[in-house]
A protein has these predicted regions:
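Non-catalytic structural scaffold of enzyme domains
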Residues: 1-207
Length: 207
């Protein structure tokens, strides 16, 4: 199966390719939509028609060479209706947003760490589809995305953003789990797990 890995930047595209390879899918095409996090956030701020038109042009250029599209970017999949495009192109399109529609059923209170407001809104909306009574504590961290893009060691990033204090706050509330609402964030998942007993949810493993 030939899979196009579409993501916001070259970094999360690479992370998506690595995730697929770990699960036995080796025939991939890398399709980063932007060169860096700021450029991607700017793209997400365009009018809906402009965003969709650009994504269509990308899909049109490769649709005869692929069997599926793996959208490994929360915020991108929250601002483009890939469900509609999947039906139109008759091409499987897997996105993180689809995973959140079942995740919300299992919890009453979640913390969501997202890259920007676009991603956070998309995650929240899809969680609420499954559970309208769910409580969500949302945090947006574009600066964390930028730090990960530099390839800085995980432990340095954890200290830079003082995640110890953030997770201490989470522990003082009734938050049941922390959702990594950005596909960059699994980069620091191992270090985050050492800070607390609160479960870390990475929807990428379910995609």
């Amino acid at each position: 199966m030939r899979i196009a890995v579409m993501a916001g930047t070259p970094m999360d595209t690479k992370l998506g390719v690595n995730l697929l390879k770990e699960n036995g899918f080796t025939q991939t095409i890398s399709v980063p939509i932007s060169n860096n996090p700021v450029e991607q956030t700017t793209f997400q701020s365009l009018e809906e028609e402009e965003r969709e038109q650009y994504i269509r042009s990308v899909i049109d250029g490769m649709k005869n060479e692929i069997d599926a599209v793996f959208v490994y970017c929360n915020s991108l999949s929250s601002v483009v209706n890939f469900d509609k495009l999947e039906e139109e192109y008759k091409l499987p399109m897997i996105t993180p947003m689809q995973m959140y529609r079942t995740l919300g059923v299992e919890h009453d209170y979640l913390a969501v760490m997202a890259a920007n407001s676009h991603g956070l809104t998309g995650v929240e909306n899809n969680l609420y589809i499954a559970n309208p009574n769910l409580k969500v504590f949302g945090v947006t961290m574009l600066e964390l995305v930028k730090a990960i893009e530099t390839g800085k060691p995980q432990e340095e990033i954890i200290k830079q953003f003082d995640f110890q204090s953030l997770f201490h706050y989470f522990e003082s509330t009734e938050i049941e789990a922390v959702v990594l609402g950005c596909t960059h964030f699994p980069y620091v998942k191992t270090e985050l797990q050492q800070l607390s007993n609160i479960p870390i949810i990475d929807v990428g493993v379910y995609m």
